[in-house]
Regions:
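Surface-exposed amphipathic alpha-helical tracts and adjacent flexible/coil segments at the periphery
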Residues: 3-353
């Protein structure tokens, strides 16, 4: 029906498994977009009324109030069967399909859908960057050459996870393994171990590389920041209030990875994507100067003033090429500049700019 109405791409619901997506691909000649990373809904896509009743906003209209991330008491025959350590009975783990990306692509998925509309720039940029890397790897090397680096999984966990990841319904595995019962939000990654606590002078052992500026969680209300880089396996000392429950042997999680945040800031935030273009400048005496810009098979030409004879300093091809390549902070980079120039003509620098 959607194809008959003119749809060229359909987005599958998150509860579909890969076999169902493959069957859909074989039956319909339309592009398929499927979810691969981010939050999962507890309810069926488009059929949840819990948010409307419990939060006053419709999840079916993109305004979910997140009732599945709230704590609940669970009863069986009148007896409470959960406690505060597993009170988030409706909160699924986040999905990560990176390890099974070849299966996803081979099932017929044309476009990967990544959560990001309500996420910060670090999340959106880094998750997309990592998935782009492995899509390219699969396309270049095939299934045999596809291998996910553990560091990339660690980076995804550092950015956001709700107690490890799940592949969701893609492999038809359902139940408790998909759930994050103890906590509904970012759980960080286990990074430090308390070696000793001497009246607030805490010695930590780094289980992973620690970066200056990393943020570590003590409890829901308290955290501290690393003041230096520390290699995995090394120890370091931090002075903290005695009241904090940092007993010997406790594992402390990193909630914010400063290195990842800096990478995104340096490579994505405020960076203008560059387009490589070719230019052809035609300078003929007694004719309008013209510039043609070429990009990906598209050509656009603009014309300027009439070119006149130089009285003192004629234009040179070298100088014109140099000025053409001065694109400043625009999105263009001049890869090749061709100049067709008559001898002895005058070209003001302002014309080229």
């Amino acid at each position: 029906l959607l194809k008959e109405l003119g749809a060229t791409r359909i987005v599958t619901s998150r509860e579909m498994n890969l076999q169902e997506i493959k069957q859909l691909h074989e039956r319909l000649d339309v592009e398929i977009e499927s979810f691969v990373h981010g939050a999962l809904c507890y309810c069926y896509s488009g059929q949840c009324l819990l948010s409307s009743f419990n939060g006053g906003r419709s999840g079916n209209r993109g305004r979910c109030a997140q009732p599945c991330r709230m704590p609940y008491d669970v009863y069986d025959n009148g007896e409470k069967i959960n406690n505060r350590n597993n009170s988030y009975a409706l909160s699924p783990k986040d999905m990560c399909a990176l390890q099974i990306l070849p299966d996803v692509i081979e099932s017929g998925v044309y476009s990967l859908k990544i959560e990001g509309r309500m996420k910060n720039v670090t999340y959106a940029a880094m998750v997309t960057h990592i998935y782009r890397k492995y899509v390219d790897m699969y396309l270049e090397r095939g299934r045999k050459g596809f291998k996910v680096d553990k560091q990339d999984i660690d980076d995804l966990s550092d950015i956001y996870n709700r107690g490890a990841f799940t592949t969701g319904y893609y492999d038809s595995v359902k139940g408790k393994k998909m759930m994050s019962l103890g906590r509904p939000n970012h759980m960080g990654t286990e990074c430090l171990k308390v070696v000793s606590n001497k009246a607030g002078r805490i010695t930590f052992k780094a289980l992973k590389n620690v970066n200056r500026g990393d943020v570590f969680e003590i409890d829901k209300e308290h955290s501290f920041e690393s003041g230096a880089d520390v290699a995995a396996g090394q120890t370091f000392v931090v002075n903290l209030p005695k009241k904090y429950p940092l007993y010997e042997g406790r594992i402390v999680s990193r909630m914010n990875n400063a290195k990842i945040k800096a990478y995104v800031a340096d490579n994505y935030v405020g960076i203008t994507p560059k387009l490589n273009v070719d230019m052809r400048l035609v300078v003929r005496k007694n004719e309008n100067i013209s510039l043609t810009v070429m990009y990906d098979g598209i050509e656009k030409t603009c014309t300027g003033e009439i070119v006149t004879e130089a009285q003192s300093r004629p234009a040179s091809e070298e100088e014109l090429v140099k000025n053409l390549k001065k694109t400043g902070d625009t999105c263009f980079v001049v890869e090749d500049a061709e100049v067709q120039l008559d001898d002895g003509v005058f070209v003001p620098v302002g014309w080229i700019k």
